């Protein structure tokens, strides 16, 4: 995916830029920041019909284009809070995990290029952007991260195991939710940026993706592959429209149901931090 930002440029100029990158560099998709007129024109453009277009739907607006998807930061924020055990998150997580509008695709992610990597999300409580030369003033301050007990790298086995478990949990939140999952390159092999959540100006090992294949990274990569295969295997995990919480598929049970400590009793109290979600359908 190529990320492109436009402000007041004419629509024709924007389309010419998109056409050039698609025809000359054969990119698969575009993360597009532009005005309403340009977004509508790009979604209707014949040359871009098979190009994945991702944007942010502001002010609750809904775009009904099959090739244009919503970059859903709402899922990220809720999933991060739920992952680290914040209170009063169950209801919000159930809502974002089942959200799957039929009119357009919905992109779910827990990390992106604009923020912490997954490894850093479970290794740092705060950003460490000193290398950017701006006195650590740049980058997002509210990351909803948790360092699992120690800030930064740790040789303690208990912390390493907890971080690995949390990273696996994070991948499951993304890949077992409805909608379209998006993974940040390198998250599957524990890539770290040493707590820097905005390394756009750093051209060094800090910002390069490290394709590690040893130890924890090898286990994480194998887990990611198995989880992706599991999602592909079961249609109920990637339905074309939102599940309705009743037997909409005529299978004998609700298509999605929530459970607490006892089956069929979902306890959404603010102090509860666990929930069971059952998908039920046919292949």
Spans of features found by a protein language model:
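Conserved alpha/beta catalytic core and glycan-binding cleft of carbohydrate-active enzymes
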Residues: 26, 39-185, 198-202, 241-242, ...
């Amino acid at each position: 995916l190529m990320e492109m930002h436009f402000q007041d440029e004419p629509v024709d100029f924007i389309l010419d830029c998109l056409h050039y990158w698609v025809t000359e560099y054969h990119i698969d998709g575009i993360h597009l920041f532009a005005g309403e007129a340009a977004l509508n024109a790009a979604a209707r453009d014949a040359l871009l019909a098979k190009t994945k277009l991702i944007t942010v739907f502001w002010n609750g607006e809904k775009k009904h284009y099959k090739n244009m998807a919503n970059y859903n930061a709402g899922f990220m924020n809720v999933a991060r809070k739920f992952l680290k055990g914040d209170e009063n998150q169950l209801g919000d997580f159930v809502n974002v995990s089942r959200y799957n509008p039929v009119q357009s695709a919905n992109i779910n992610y827990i990390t992106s290029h604009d923020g912490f990597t997954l490894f850093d999300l479970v290794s740092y409580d705060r950003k460490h952007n000193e290398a950017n030369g701006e006195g650590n003033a740049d980058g997002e301050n509210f990351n909803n991260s948790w360092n699992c007990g120690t800030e930064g790298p740790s040789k303690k086995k208990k912390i390493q195991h907890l971080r690995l478990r949390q990273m696996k949990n994070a991948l499951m939140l993304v890949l077992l939710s409805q909608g379209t999952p998006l993974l940040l390159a390198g998250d599957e092999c524990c890539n770290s940026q040493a707590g820097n959540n905005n390394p756009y100006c750093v051209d060094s090992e800090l910002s390069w993706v490290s394709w590690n294949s040893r130890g924890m990274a090898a286990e994480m990569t194998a887990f990611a592959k198995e989880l992706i295969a599991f999602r592909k295997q079961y249609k109920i995990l990637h339905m074309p429209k939102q599940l309705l919480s009743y037997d909409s598929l005529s299978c004998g049970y609700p298509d999605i149901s929530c459970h607490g400590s006892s089956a069929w009793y979902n306890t959404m109290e603010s102090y509860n931090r666990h929930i069971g979600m059952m998908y039920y359908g046919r292949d």
